Amino acid sequence: MFNRLLITVCALYASGVATAQIRVVSYNSAQFNGDANAMAEVLQAASDDDSHGFAVPVSIFLFQEVDEALLATLQNVVGSGYSMATFTDQNDSSWGGAQAMFYNSTQFVENSALHEDIFTGAGRHADRWALNVSGYSGKRIYLYSMHLKSSTGSSNQETRRQGVENVRDDIMTLPTGSHIIVVGDMNFYSPNEPGYIWFTEAGDGQVIDPLGNGDWGGGSNTLKHTQSPLLNQDGGLIGGGLDDRFDFQFLSSSLIDGGGFDLISGTYRALGNDGNHYNDAINAGNNYYFPGDTARGNALADKLIISSDHMPLIADYQVPAILGWSFEDDRVLVGADANFLVRNDAQVVVSQGADVLDVDIDFSGGLSGSTSVSIPAMSAPEEVALPVDTSISGSWDGVVTLTSTSPEVQTVPEIVKLSGDVIEHANASFAFDEDLDWYTYDISFDGNSGVQSFNVWLFNYGFDGSQSLLEIDDVTTPDLPIVFNGLSTNSVGSIPALMEFEIDTDSVPPDTYTSFLPISFSDEDLAGEQNGISMLTVRVDVIPSTSCDADFDGDGEVDVADILILIADWGGSDPAHDLDGNGIVGVSDLLLLIAAWGPCT
């Protein structure tokens, strides 16, 4: 039945993640006596769980009560995006099931040579795995999973204690300061049990209960309980309601010391446990596990009671900060800061998913001084102004030494040799040999001479290798009939930009045409970039190409407009309109105008 049901659930999991942030889930699979579809949906819900502020794909699944014959089935439920770690079954399947671990292979690489089986009594074994953390040189997490002997009574308690002793003895063989997560169905009934005390008492190999060593019995501690999510037995799933804390994730002190790899405060929880179902089924009435989304909580609770008779445990862990830096200000403008960027490159979903990066920065060589920065994960890079004199142009060099004081970031300081140049600002000018910011360009053309083109040069005055290029950002469109046809280049160094203009002399009467053209410019896109405006005035005279006496308006043609001018002066004595020179503007002048009708020749 289990394999047949899997046909509908194999596609639930994505194959990869884009984060280094760690989420660990431990879950007693109840020897797969539950519903396969429900199990797959519960595991997906573990990745989607944002009840404590954020969701992140599960990095590591640890299962108890796993039958070797169903490993392929379990792999399908977990999803193809996870790799199965070393699996061993020393007849554990006959004694309550073996242990299995699946991990995201984009985050970890298993060191299989470090796998161990540890006898824990009652025919069962704990497994120890070692995962090297990708992206962190030399960083490793050890994980233990176990299923200790169940039931009350001093004999069963002693069996559990002996199993814990064997596990703690193994922990003591690991390097000092190792990161260790110990999970499983421990079957501890109280913190007074010898096995629990053996795990948590001070000394070598101690592991810590994230919820503290206080009592977990009774309704006031329901949030801590993990068994059983169902009230009445359902096939192979044991009932009884939610009133026991059998499942644990114990941690080494290195995972709860506030730095580097570390448990994120407040994220240790039983998936779907809203604290309101003491000694009852987790789906009795409403489930408020997801704040403000009761329907979602109810849907999860319905899956939990048919998936297993335990609740999954989830804990989120921060990763160490990652020191990153960049330097792009090898060329800056006079008066600007030359900035060195320091980054926290930890790839996480939320800022608390990685440690804060604390860095001490020392300057030497041609530089001097020191400073320090603190950069939370997902923050913008911190700009550190280098102690460079940028008041004058010139070259510089120096050494920057970065030493992180954040745990587990680096083992040696990072030493960076730098050099750069301070350059002068660009200087727009309409002349090569002088700084000319305001300029009037005069030119004349004969009327009726067609389209006439003309050019104006714009220089970067004084340009050499120690000066910024001149970026021409905008040339104001001139008033018609003057037309701007564009620039030969928008970036001016030693070669000037050619601004191309034209005017159609056939379409306009003789006149003086003037246009004012503010030109916006700036430095290169460098630190200290400045903007400016130069003013160009273009003045074009269109003059008559030919003239005749009767062409009063000077447009090169005798026509109606000239008659109207003559009539307006009828009877007057203006010599310009007295074509026959008899001292009065009259009929004889009109006849002479008509005789000259048409273009002047």
Give short role names for the model-derived ranges:
Residues 101, 551, 578:
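Conserved beta-strand positions that form and line the central face of beta-propeller blades
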Residues 20-321:
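Divalent cation-coordinating acidic motifs and surrounding scaffolds
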Residues 72-77, 552-573, 581-601:
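Alpha-helical segments with a strong preference for the paired helices of cellulosomal dockerin domains
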Residues 30, 66-68, 80, 107-108, ...:
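Acidic glycine-/aspartate-rich tracts in secreted/extracellular proteins
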Residues 1-7:
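Bacterial N-terminal signal peptides that target proteins for export
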Residues 14-17:
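N-terminal signal peptide c-region/cleavage motif recognized by signal peptidases
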